[in-house]
Amino acid sequence: NVDPAATSRIDLAQLLNGGPPKDGIPSIDAPEFDTAATTPFQKEDIVIGVVLNGEAKAYPYNVMNWHEIVNDTVGGVNVTVTYCPLCDTIVAFERGNTTFGVSGKLYQSCLVMFDRNDDSLYAQPWAMGVIGLQVNQTLTRLPAVKTTWAAWVAQYPDSQILSTRTGYDRDYQRYPYGPYETNEQIIFPVRHQDQLTQHPKAIVSYVWQADDATPFNQFSGDS
C-alpha cells in the first residue's frame, strides 16, 4: 500500500476519474495480427506504425480508440503501444517483463496508465511515473509514427496490422466518442486553456533545446 500523496509529482486534485474504472477500457495483452491481404481496414485508415529489428507492425486507430494500450513484442523487444483518444497522443516504449493497463484516471485530459507489477501510475504523453513506486521514472521510448495504412504498407509491405480479433465485442468501424473528433469541446479540464489562440484541439509541434528558453506563448506550465 503506497500513499499517493507521499509518492506523487502531480497535484492529486488534477487526477480525475475518466468514467470507466481501472481496466474498464481493456488493454490488448495477446494481440493477433493480419496482413495487407487479410485486414479489413482501408488504405486511408490511420495507424500507429512501429518497426524494430526489421519487424514492422501497425496498430489502427479504429482498434486503439477502444483499447488505448497494446502489450506486444516487436522485433524480439517487449513493447507497449499506447494511444489517448482524448488528446491524440501516441507513445510506444519498452515494457520489460511487465504489462500496462488503462487506470481509468486522466491527467490534463490525457491517458494515465498503470504498471501491473506495482500499480505505479504513468502519464502517457510524458511516459513518466507520476504516482507510486516509479514516480519520476521515465520509460524508454521507441519510435512510433502516425500515418495512413496506405503510406505505412507502401514503406513496409510485409508489415502486420493489428486484428479485430481482440476477444472483445466491439464495433471497430464505429468511433466511440461521438462528435469529439471534430468539435471544439474538451471534456476534461486542462491548464492554461485560456491562453490558447488556436483551436482547442490544434496539433502543436515544438522543438525544445536544452538551455534555451521555452518560446513565449507556445508552451507553459509544469510537465
Language-model region placement:
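Mid-to-C-terminal functional-domain signal that highlights helix-capping/loop sites
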Residues: 1-223
